[in-house]
Amino acid sequence: MKKIGVITNREKDKGLKYTNQLVESIEKHGGQAVLPTYDGSFQMDDIDNQVVEICNNCDMVICLGGDGTFLRTARTAYLYGLPMLGINLGSLGFLTDVEKGEIDKAVENILNNRFCLEDRIMLTSKLYKDGKLIARDVAINDIVISRGGIPRILHLSTYIDNNLVEMFPGDGIVVATPTGSTAYSLSAGGPIVEPTSGLILITPICPHILSSRALITSDMRKIKICVSQGFEHKATVTVDGQKNLEITGGDYLEIEKANSTVKIIRVNSKNFFTVLRSKIYERKEE
């Protein structure tokens, strides 16, 4: 019997209509639903502890919410090597494969082993101040170095395998995985790449230079981004749009492919280009 962990963004499923539907489908098709304890209140930060609570007692995780909920869940679930499926209760839903009306069919497919797994690369980031490592993290979508709310140009020297590529003046840089190519990197003018590609994207944000363009490199490369010594203000490093750190002149980031991957369950026959067309090119705002 497959044990399926269930994580819900209760802000998007306040009456638990879709959560209850999911649990009923799991039990109907011969599985066992594993749910975290609930104390009557909910904040997005609660998801981290909920994932830890259920991951030791399940074979996979299904989360209900938007892409933000999926990222929040996956950033912990990957530590347990568990595959994940997302049910879209948000607006765009690039990472959440299943729509609300497809829940029962998706569960039936999973419990009858009619699904495939996609291994998506992640990035590790290490932040150095005065030459000392002070923080490290992993990203599924992207790592963003930005000027934040400071109205000053941020000068970022970017290296690949210790070779200087460019000194980017502007609002910052997005370093993205293929999975993250349809997120902030896309909005900043970066290319769209297939999510299972072995690539890393580097996209300047509002660069104050005519020749500056996004670039793509192999995921075997190591990237270093240095803040110019003369920058006296506080800029920001943001990981997957969820974790923030301060960075200032002389600080630098080292970024490379992580040793682990995120395992994403796919139950739909829609290929990436079909999803891309429906989510981006033909999108209708609600």
Curated annotation (Swiss-Prot):
The keyword NAD applies. Its cofactor is a divalent metal cation. It is found in: Cytoplasm. One of its GO terms (molecular function) is NAD binding. It catalyses: NAD(+) + ATP = ADP + NADP(+) + H(+). Its main location: cytoplasm. The active site is at D67 (proton acceptor). InterPro entries: ATP-NAD_kinase_N (IPR017438), ATP-NAD_kinase_PpnK-typ_C (IPR017437), NAD/diacylglycerol_kinase_sf (IPR016064), NADK (IPR002504). NAD(+) binds at D67, G68, R72, N141, D142, R152, D171, T182, A183, Y184, S185, L186, S187, Q242. HAMAP family: NAD_kinase. This is NAD kinase. The gene is nadK.
